[in-house]
Each structure stands twice: as C-alpha cells, then as structure tokens.
Amino acid sequence: MLRRNLDERDAQTKQLQDAVTNVEKHFGELCQIFAAYVRKTARLRDKADLLVNEINLYASTETPNLKQGLKDFADEFAKLQDYRQAEVERLEAKVVEPLKAYGTIVKMKRDDLKATLTARNREAKQLSQLERTRQRNPSDRHVISQAETELQRATIDATRTSRHLEETIDNFEKQKIKDIKNILSEFITIEMLFHGKALEVFTAAYQNIQNIDEDEDLEVFRNSLYLSDYPSRLDIVRANSKSPLQRSLSTKCTSGTGQISTCRTRKDQQVEDEDDEELDVTEDEN
C-alpha cells in the first residue's frame, strides 16, 4: 500500500515537473522573440530618424512649396518616432520584463521540486531499509520498530513537502495563465495605441505632401533658368527706352579712353578744315 502511494506521488511529481519545464521552455522562447521584436522596432526608429534628417537636408535645396511640404512631412514623421520610442519603452516594461521574470519564478519552483524529490527519496529509502530489516531480522522487534519510526518521519516530511508542492504548482499555474493573458493584452494595447497615433500622423503627413503646389514651384523653377540673363536684358530695355540725345551722350560718356581719342581727332580735323578754308579765301583775294 505504501509502495503504491509512493509510485502515485512520483507520477504526480513528474507531471508537476513537466509543467514547470514546459513554462520554462516556452516563456523563455517568447521572451527572446519579444526582445528581438523590441530591438527591431528600436532600429526602425533609428532609421526613421535618419530619414527625417535626409528629408530636411533635401528640402533646404528645393523650391518654396516643395521645401515647405517636405519640412512639414519630416516634422510629422519625426513626431511618429516619438510615439515609436514610447512604444519601445512600454513593450520593454510591460511585455519583455514580465516574461524575463519567469526565469526567477521557474528557478524557485524547481527548488520546491528538488526539496519534494529529496523528501520522497528519503521516504523510499527508509521503506526499502524497513523491508530489508524485516527480511533479515524478522524477530528483532527493536530494530524493526526503529526502522518503522524513521519511515514514519520520512513519510510525514514527504507528505508535507508534496502538499506544499501541489499548492505551489497550483498557484504557479493560476498565475501563469493570468500573466500570459496580461502580457499579450498589454502587447496588443501598446501596438493599437501606436498604430492609432501612426494613422493620425500619416494622414497629416500625406496631406502635407498633397498640398504642395506643383504648378507654382514649376513656375519658380522656370523663372530661375533665366535669372543669369536678367542684367543683360535689363540693359537692353533701358537702352531702348532712352532718347537719341541720351543715347549719344551715353555713348560718348561711357565709351572709355578710345572713344575720347576719337572725339579729339574729329575736333582737330574740323580746325584743320577751317584753316584750309581761310587759306583759300586769302589766295583768291590776291
């Protein structure tokens, strides 16, 4: 009868041990995968920050409407990364850390299992010793009575530890179910909050891009192609708008040293012509 009870308790202990091992395995895997998920999200935030910087740099080189639209888009996208940072921090605190805590919890349950197994092994050892004593010395009541007393103590201790283990594992199972529900609920809530904010931000960012006036920026670009010719064209317009006298004065005053020499040559030629005319008149009179 006692041997059968021992076998039943051993089977029960094995089942409890398997339950703890199962949680240790799968919670450990979940912890690693969720931690990798959080790291990937953090890296996505870092890449998005680089994208924001590049968009701002590009915007500074563009036409007014496109420049403003790109900057507004970058501002919205940067705001989204603030929400993503909050997402990372919440996932770390509400999902990864509780799963990580199960490493310590499982270790404590294994210690309880170890204590129970030790007590049951002691009980089984005392039972075997009693059976051997009865076989070897069936008439030695003192030795048999002493062995029975030791077995009784071992049985009481094993029963106590077994009951404690059952209660502990029962609470462990109850807490495990509650925790995994809370962890996954927190995960879903955090993701929904982020994606809800992301939808708002992306809607605003999309509108900023759609508000860019393509025609106006194209006109600005086309006008910029002729900016280098603007001074010469202005000079032509100004020249065409002057009177003949103004053009003559402008030509004489702005022609430089070579033009001054030409004016002086013409004046000298005029003086020489006048002298020749006076000489001709004098000769006729003579």
From Swiss-Prot:
Disruption phenotype: Knockout homozygous mice show uni- or bilateral abnormal bone growth or exostosis on the deltoid tuberosity of the humerus, abnormalities at the left stifle consistent with a tendon calcification, and abnormal digit morphology including polysyndactyly and osteomas on the hind paw metatarsals. Exhibit male fertility defects, caused by kinked sperm flagella with the annulus mispositioned in the principal piece of the sperm. Residues 1-47 form a transit peptide. It is found in: Cytoplasm; Cytoplasm, Cytoskeleton, Microtubule organizing center, Centrosome, Centriole; Cytoplasm, Cytoskeleton, Cilium basal body; Cell projection, Cilium. Residues 107-178 form a coiled coil. It comes from the Eukaryota. Its main location: cytoplasm. One of its GO terms (biological process) is positive regulation of smoothened signaling pathway. Disulfide bonds: none annotated. Residues 258-286 are annotated as: Disordered. GO terms for cellular component: centriole; ciliary basal body; ciliary transition zone; cilium; cytoplasm; mitochondrial inner membrane; mitochondrion; nucleus. SUPFAM superfamilies: BAR/IMD domain-like. Residues 271-286 have a biased composition (Acidic residues). Residues 10-220 are annotated as: BAR-like. Expressed in the heart, liver, spleen, lung, kidney, brain and muscle (at protein level). Strongly expressed throughout the developing limb bud, including the progress zone and the apical ectodermal ridge. It is a peripheral membrane protein. Keywords: Cell projection, Cilium, Cilium biogenesis/degradation, Coiled coil, Cytoplasm, Cytoskeleton, Differentiation, Flagellum, Membrane, Mitochondrion, Mitochondrion inner membrane, Nucleus, Spermatogenesis, Transit peptide. Homodimer (via BAR-like domain). Heterodimer with FAM92B (via BAR-like domains). Interacts (via BAR-like domain) with CBY1; this interaction is required for targeting FAM92A to centriole and cilium basal body. Interacts (via BAR-like domain) with CBY3; both proteins form a ninefold symmetric structure at the flagellar base; are recruited to the annulus in a mutually dependent manner and regulate annulus positionning. The BAR-like domain displays limited similarity to other BAR domains. Plays a critical role in regulating mitochondrial ultrastructure and function by maintaining the integrity of mitochondrial morphology, particularly the organization of cristae. Preferentially binds to negatively charged phospholipids like cardiolipin and phosphatidylinositol 4,5-bisphosphate enhancing its interaction with mitochondrial membranes. Induces membrane curvature and tubulation, which are critical for maintaining mitochondrial ultrastructure and the organization of cristae. Plays a crucial role in ciliogenesis. May play a role in limb development through its role in ciliogenesis. Belongs to the CIBAR family. This is CBY1-interacting BAR domain-containing protein 1. It comes from Mus musculus (Mouse).
